Every structure is written in structure tokens, then in C-alpha cells.
């Protein structure tokens, strides 16, 4: 079970939002590169970056900070990025800079042809990010709820050749209310590609619950607010996951 620290970038700083609200953010660091190094030193085996401004603007905004992070740690661990990625040129540029995985969310839902083209051009590097509330997919930085069922869309995108799915339960994100295990398992069981859980991770018990269902196809979990507030000790949590899964 991969525990993947999230570094959410807003105006060049590391922040956390509550339920995707750009007006309700807490700054946890002024130096994104130092934050990336901090998580690497704590034992992270992958990093999750989000260009928050980019997600709302529909184009890259925090690219300088992202490039600096890739320069610092991109040769050491895989880095994945979401937010504001709407065209193939942007994907190519980020991959050339050392990014391992591009996360396509809103653009995949609104323009499935773009996702298909991205999978064709950059096979092995495309992850789809599906954000859902009560099983329905949301787009545009979670501001718009669609009528799409998350399982149906994920199966369609699996056929396109995406590398995996990051599933975020919007109702829980940033609330430290616990991962929606049932919904995540339901999605993983419907797919053959890996699912990464996201939204609401609160404590070591969540990690233990996820490890218990890892065999259903859950590859990892995005760690956000809990590792910044101290509710979850990242290094201890990864060690616990490794011990439970026999990786230690």
C-alpha cells in the first residue's frame, strides 16, 4: 500500500483546502521544494502534486514550483500531478521535465477524446482523477456535479488505456472524517486497473482498513490534511502499511 503525500499548490505555497473550497485554505508551507524533500526523507515512495490555481483556471499556473519540485526529487521517486492539464502540449512539457504521471480529471469527463488521445500519445503515464459525491462525478474543481456514475465512467476510461484511477470522495476531503472504504472498494472491484483512494484520510485506523482491502485492487492512498496537522505520522503509517502487507 503506497501512502502518497499530497502537495497542493496555491499561489506558489503549500496549502490544504476544505472540500475543494479555494476560499477555505490553510497554508502549511511557503517552500514547495522543501516540502517535497520533507516527505521524501520521511519515506514517501511517490508524491502527489495538485496545481489548485490551475484546476480552476483550466491551465497551468504553478508550473515554476512544480518544475522546481521535479528538479529536486523527480529522479528519486515518481511524481504525479493534477490540475489545469487540458492539452497534449502541457502533458508533454511536464513529462519532459521529469513528471511520471499526469492526472486528468475534468478534461477527461468533458472531453473523453482528449483522454483517449493522451493515452495513445503517452501510454503508461496517464491517470484519471474521478471526484465524486454520492457516486456522481463532479468537475471543475468540484464546483459542478454531473449525472455520470463514477463506476461507469471509470470502466469507459479503463478501456482507453489509463494507468489507474484516483478516486476522491468530495464529501470527505479535507474533513478528516475517514476514507469512504465501501465506495472505493466498489470501484476497485469493477476495474482491473489500480485504484488510489483519496479524500478524508484521518488516522492509522484508516490505513489499516485500506490494507485489509488492498487485494481488491487498491494500490495506494493520497495523504493530505492529516499528515500536515499531525493527526497521522506519515513515516509510522507507511511502516504500518508495509508491516500489514508483508513489505517490511
Swiss-Prot record:
InterPro entries in the cross-refs: Aldolase_TIM, His_biosynth, HisA_bact_arch, Isoase_HisA-like, Isoase_HisA-like_bact, RibuloseP-bd_barrel
Record's GO cellular component terms: cytoplasm
Main location class: cytoplasm
GO biological process terms, semicolon-separated: L-histidine biosynthetic process; L-tryptophan biosynthetic process
Keyword Electron transport (UniProt): no
Keywords: Amino-acid biosynthesis, Cytoplasm, Histidine biosynthesis, Isomerase
Root EC class: isomerase
EC number: 5.3.1.16
Signal peptide: none
SUPFAM superfamilies cross-referenced by the UniProt entry: Ribulose-phoshate binding barrel (SSF51366)
Pathway: Amino-acid biosynthesis; L-histidine biosynthesis; L-histidine from 5-phospho-alpha-D-ribose 1-diphosphate: step 4/9
Catalytic site: 8, 131
A Pfam short name: His_biosynth
Reactions catalysed according to its record: 1-(5-phospho-beta-D-ribosyl)-5-[(5-phospho-beta-D-ribosylamino)methylideneamino]imidazole-4-carboxamide = 5-[(5-phospho-1-deoxy-D-ribulos-1-ylimino)methylamino]-1-(5-phospho-beta-D-ribosyl)imidazole-4-carboxamide
GO molecular function, one term: 1-(5-phosphoribosyl)-5-[(5-phosphoribosylamino)methylideneamino]imidazole-4-carboxamide isomerase activity
Compartments where found: Cytoplasm
Similarity annotation: Belongs to the HisA/HisF family.
Name under which the protein is recorded: 1-(5-phosphoribosyl)-5-[(5-phosphoribosylamino)methylideneamino] imidazole-4-carboxamide isomerase
Organism the protein comes from: Methylibium petroleiphilum (strain ATCC BAA-1232 / LMG 22953 / PM1)
Gene that encodes the chain: hisA
